[in-house]
Amino acid sequence: MMMILKPLSSHHVSNFRLSVSFLHSVALSDAKVPVEEEGDDAETVFRMINGSNLQVELKESLSSSGIHLSKDLIDRVLKRVRFSHGNPIQTLEFYRYASAIRGFYHSSFSLDTMLYILGRNRKFDQIWELLIETKRKDRSLISPRTMQVVLGRVAKLCSVRQTVESFWKFKRLVPDFFDTACFNALLRTLCQEKSMTDARNVYHSLKHQFQPDLQTFNILLSGWKSSEEAEAFFEEMKGKGLKPDVVTYNSLIDVYCKDREIEKAYKLIDKMREEEETPDVITYTTVIGGLGLIGQPDKAREVLKEMKEYGCYPDVAAYNAAIRNFCIARRLGDADKLVDEMVKKGLSPNATTYNLFFRVLSLANDLGRSWELYVRMLGNECLPNTQSCMFLIKMFKRHEKVDMAMRLWEDMVVKGFGSYSLVSDVLLDLLCDLAKVEEAEKCLLEMVEKGHRPSNVSFKRIKLLMELANKHDEVNNLIQKMAIFSTEIPR
C-alpha cells in the first residue's frame, strides 16, 4: 500500500491510500499502452491519410503501397481515424478510393463510422452525397442505425427543426424501410442531443404517423428529471397494452433516483419482482447513485452486497457509482477500499475510476500526485479519456508546467486518446502566455496534421507570437497546411 494524498485540511480531504494492485509504481517511459503495431497495415494507411494534403497524393500512396484493402482493414482504419480525430476530408477520399475498386463493397460499420467522422466535422453536404452514392451501389448498408448516426451529428450542431427535417430527408432517400424503428431513432437522438421536452413534443406531433412500441416508450422514459413526466409516459404505455420490461423499469427507477425519491425506486423494484422481472446490474447501479445523491454512501455500499444475494454481481460501473459517493463525501479511504475490492474480484478500474480521484486531486490542486496518478494510469494500460486530459491540462496550466503539458500532448498524439480540440485550447494558451513559440508551433502543426482545426483565438495568438519571433516562413508554411480546412483562415 502507499499514501498518495497528504492530509489537506483546507479542503477537508482525509488521508487515503491507493492499492498497489490498482496503481503499481511504474516509470512513464516503461508504460505499456496498447497501440497499433508499427508494421500494421491499418496504422500505415492511417498515416497515409493524415500525411497527405492532396487527393492525388493519397491515391498515389495507396496505389504504390501494395496493401490489400479488405473490409476488415477499412473498418480498422476508420475506427482509428474516429478515435484519433484524423483528417475527415482525406478520410472520405480514402473511403471513396476503396469504393471504386471493382467488386468491393463497404461494411455497414464503415459507412456509419465514415458518416460519424463527417458529421463531427460539420461536413453535412458530404454526408448526403455519400448516402446518395451508397444508395446507388449498396442500399442494404443504410439502416436505422445509419440514420441515428447522421441525426445525432445534426442534432449535436443544429436545431430541433433541422434535425426533424433531416429525418424526413432520410424518408425521401430510403422510403422502403421507414418505420417505427426510424421514429425511435429520431426520439433517441433528441433525448441524447437535445432535451426530453423536445423529444416529448416531437413524439406527440408525429406519433399518429407511426405505431409506437415498447422501445418507443423505453426511450421516452429515460432521462427525465421530473417523475411526473415519466409516469405519464408509463401510463400511456400501459394504456396501449404494452408490458414493461427490465429496461422500462430501470428507466423509471433512474428518474426516481435522480429526483431523490428513493422510496419510490425501492417500491418499483418490489413491483418488478412481483411481475417476475429480475432487477439487473443497471437497476442496482442506479440505486447506488441515488443513495449517493441523498448522502447515504454507506447504504449504497451495502447494495453491492445485497445484489450478490440475488445472484447479480457488480461490474465496474456499479463500483464506480459507489466510489463516486465516497469521493463526494470526502471519505477517500473508503473509496480506495472499494477500488481494492473490485481489483481483487478481477475487475479493472477504467478511466472513469481514475477520474473520480483526478477530480479530488484537482480540487486539492495537488500537482505532484496528479502526475503520479497519470503515470500509473498509463502503466496499468488504461488510456485516459477527454475528462482525464482536461483535469490534467488545466492543472498544468495553473502551475505553468510546460514540460508536463507537453508530455501529455505527446502521449495523446502517439497513443491516440483525448480531444485535441479541447486540450489544445488550454495547452496553446499556456504556451503563448509563457512565450514558448517553438513548442506552440510544434503542437499546432501536429494538430493540423491530425486533421483538426485550431480555434481562431489560438491560431491568432500563435501566429502573432511567431511573427514577433521573425518566423515568417514558418507562418506561411502553417497557413499552407491549414488550407485543408474549408473555412477561412483568420488573419
From Swiss-Prot:
Stretches forming PPR repeats: 179-209, 210-244, 245-279, 280-314, 315-349, 350-384, 385-419, 420-454
Keywords of this entry: Repeat
Membership in a protein family: Belongs to the PPR family. P subfamily.
Protein name per its UniProtKB record: Putative pentatricopeptide repeat-containing protein At1g02420
Disulfide bonds: none
